[in-house]
Amino acid sequence: MLHIAPPQAAPDFVRNSVLAHQEGPSKGWLNVDIHTLQHKNYPNIFGLGDVAALPTAKTGAAIRKQAPVVARNIAAILAKKAFDDKQYEGYSSCPLVTGYGEMVLAEFKYDNVVD
């Protein structure tokens, strides 16, 4: 069985803007801190999911862990408070079909750490 993911790219309006990395392996992806998901140059911008330059798989499982971090960080900015220590740890997962009615759920975090 073969599992192939299509090529991924951020939307044109991000890739072709000053918000994206302009060179290197993250070229075209939104330039965010990998833990806070806050843009590195524009603190009022956050990115998650298929647009962010994160060294992880762009999956629904990743978004599920990224969204609460972004929500808390935006709430902190609105309340004029510092970010708490809740950060995105790079979680992502990918279901791999191994046979009829069978699969393996591969889970990852930054540095290959899994709870």
Language model features with spans:
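FAD-site-proximal beta/loop scaffold in flavoenzymes
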Residues: M1-K65, A75-A76
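C-terminal, flexible cofactor-proximal segment of oxidoreductases
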Residues: I74-D115
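Short, low-complexity, polar/charged sequence segments that are solvent-exposed and flexible
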Residues: Q22-G24, R64-P68, K81, V113-D115
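Broad hydrophobic/π-residue packing in well-ordered secondary structure
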Residues: I4-A5, P43-F46, V69, K86-E89, ...
